[in-house]
């Protein structure tokens, strides 16, 4: 039977396979479209199995927030190359998979693989996608947050490589206003990469080692600043608010009072001076919080205030207390070792 260009085109559109693969399948199937699809499927499965061994470190992040800001899902799905990550078929696969995860309340990869999507087992569905798209695809991680009576929102950066979701309890606060504010916090987190919400999540051993590293870093910088004749960095006693007890705060207040007395400042104005000096002490001794905690970072839209201060201001403005309860940030390829090959070796490998 003669294989026409239209037959090849129809088979390609229905399967997404390459043009030459479609032509060969039609020849093998003697022009039978259904048999040709079966041939491609069988060959595709073989190709997909080989592709599944290849490292997938590119891809996309997807953020899906429902209409009333009560539920959000974030996912990272990897491909082998940035080229495929921009492919419409891959983008649709990522969006459909994330929606399936949210709609089906799926919490882990095993449950995802065993679930049904469009009447097909997901493990078979992704294998077919690998065969069609032509690269190994991996659902690396995903998470769904329920606001549990609070409000949440999410942000996906324009390149779809960084996504954030944040939830909060919002007492007597208009949901839309709260959601809009949380969106701004998500944008901040996308840019500034906080690791945790608060210093309260830090481990004491971690803080101890980070303080040592921080001091060494600042002392090294001071060597260069001294050489240039510039003001030196303050070497902190502490790295985080977690290390500063109420007793330490009180001792610092006493130290400030003694300094003010020595300077001859009238005692009646001490109460106006002490808060500012204490704030400076805390700023100098919480550098780790400013780098790694969402609440301790300075807001990208107003770098004179920390996120915690901005939240306090918004709580007063909205007439109800806002408390951050969950924060998740994904960036494509975080922690993955990217495979590096020279171009000649890559071409040789593809030729076989």
From Swiss-Prot:
Keywords, alphabetical: Cytoplasm, Elongation factor, Protein biosynthesis
Keyword Cell inner membrane appears in the UniProt entry: no
Stretches for region Involved in Mg(2+) ion dislocation from EF-Tu: 81-84
Subcellular location: Cytoplasm
Organism, scientific name: Campylobacter hominis (strain ATCC BAA-381 / DSM 21671 / CCUG 45161 / LMG 19568 / NCTC 13146 / CH001A)
Chief location of this protein within or outside the cell: cytoplasm
Cytoplasm as UniProt keyword: yes
Source organism superkingdom: Bacteria
PROSITE patterns reported in the protein's UniProt record: EF_TS_1, EF_TS_2
GO molecular function: translation elongation factor activity
Protein family according to the UniProt entry: Belongs to the EF-Ts family.
Full protein name: Elongation factor Ts
UniProt GO cellular component terms: cytoplasm
Matches recorded under InterPro entries: EF-Ts_dimer_sf, Transl_elong_EFTs/EF1B, Transl_elong_EFTs/EF1B_dimer, Transl_elong_Ts_CS, UBA-like_sf
């Amino acid at each position: 039977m003669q294989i026409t260009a239209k037959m090849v085109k129809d088979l390609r559109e229905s399967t997404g396979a390459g043009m030459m693969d479609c032509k060969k399948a039609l020849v093998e199937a003697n022009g039978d479209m259904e048999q040709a699809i079966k041939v491609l499927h069988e060959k595709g499965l073989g190709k997909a199995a080989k592709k599944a061994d290849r490292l997938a470190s590119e891809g996309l992040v997807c953020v899906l927030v429902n209409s009333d800001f009560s539920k959000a899902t974030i996912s990272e799905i990897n491909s082998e190359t940035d080229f495929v990550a921009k492919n419409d078929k891959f983008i649709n696969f990522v969006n459909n998979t994330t929606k399936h995860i949210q709609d089906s309340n799926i919490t882990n990869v095993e449950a995802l693989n065993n679930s049904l999507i469009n009447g097909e087992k997901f493990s078979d569905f992704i294998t077919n996608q690998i065969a069609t798209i032509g690269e190994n695809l991996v659902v690396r991680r995903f998470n769904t947050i329920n606001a549990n009576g609070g409000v949440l929102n999410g942000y996906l950066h324009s390149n779809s490589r960084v996504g954030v979701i944040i939830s909060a309890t919002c007492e007597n606060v208009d949901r839309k206003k709260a959601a809009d504010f949380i969106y701004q916090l998500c944008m901040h987190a996308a840019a500034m990469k906080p690791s945790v919400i608060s210093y309260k999540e830090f481990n004491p051993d971690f803080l101890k080692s980070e303080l040592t590293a921080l001091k060494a870093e600042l002392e090294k910088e001071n060597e260069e600043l001294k050489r240039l004749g510039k003001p030196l960095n303050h070497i902190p006693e502490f790295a985080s608010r977690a290390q500063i007890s109420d007793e330490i705060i009180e001792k610092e207040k006493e130290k400030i009072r003694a300094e003010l007395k020595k300077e001859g400042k009238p005692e009646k104005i001490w109460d106006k001076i002490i808060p500012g000096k204490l704030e400076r002490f805390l700023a100098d001794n919480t550098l780790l919080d400013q780098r790694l905690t969402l609440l301790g970072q300075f807001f990208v839209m107003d770098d004179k205030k920390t996120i915690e201060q901005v939240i306090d201001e918004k709580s007063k403005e909205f007439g109800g207390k806002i408390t951050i309860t969950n924060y998740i940030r994904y960036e494509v390829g975080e922690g993955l070792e990217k495979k590096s090959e020279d171009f000649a070796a890559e071409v040789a490998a593809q030729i076989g």
